[in-house]
Amino acid sequence: IFGAPLRTAGVVDVLLAFVERIAKTSRSMSLGVLILHAVFFTITGAYYVSYPVVGGMVKDLYPEYHLDRKNLMRTMLDTGTGLAPMVSWSTTGSYTTTTLGVSNLAFAPFAPMLWLSIVFSVIYAVTGIGTAKAKED
């Protein structure tokens, strides 16, 4: 529902231009996609929108930076998993709020696996540890 209007309004192009502007190395590309997906997921609150839209936007850029595309999915899964319960308008956020009876951010300190996935994703992006390189054809 949100993907097409965001593409039509040019939001997707602006976000992609941001990533292309900051991405000078494979590490900055990974970090840029992490930020891009976090922003896009927070706007839409839906995996089924953010994964195909962000993935479709940047999948062709990864080989240019000698990155295997599996890194793209790992980055999006890390940010999506970590943010989903924190975004109150997402399905996961609504569920956790209703089930636990507390605000989304109130349980964050008690769920380190959520935000640690993002922390480790940033560490992997910055250091290059665990980052698969694209195979030469």
Regions found by a protein language model. Give the residues of each.
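Hydrophobic transmembrane alpha-helices of multi-pass solute/ion transporters
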Residues: I1, V14-F18, I22-A23
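Alpha-helical membrane-inserting segments
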Residues: F2, L6, F40, F120-Y124, ...
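Short helix-coil transition sites and intra-membrane helix breaks within transmembrane domains
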Residues: G3-D13, F41-V53, L83-S90
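Re-entrant/interfacial helical elements at transmembrane boundaries that shape
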Residues: V14-A17, Y48-Y62, S90-G101
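Hydrophobic alpha-helical transmembrane segments of multi-pass integral membrane proteins
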Residues: V19-M57
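Alpha-helical transmembrane segments of multi-pass membrane proteins
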Residues: S28-F41, Y65-M86, F110-I118
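Juxtamembrane and boundary regions of transmembrane helices in multi-pass small-molecule transporters
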Residues: G93-D137
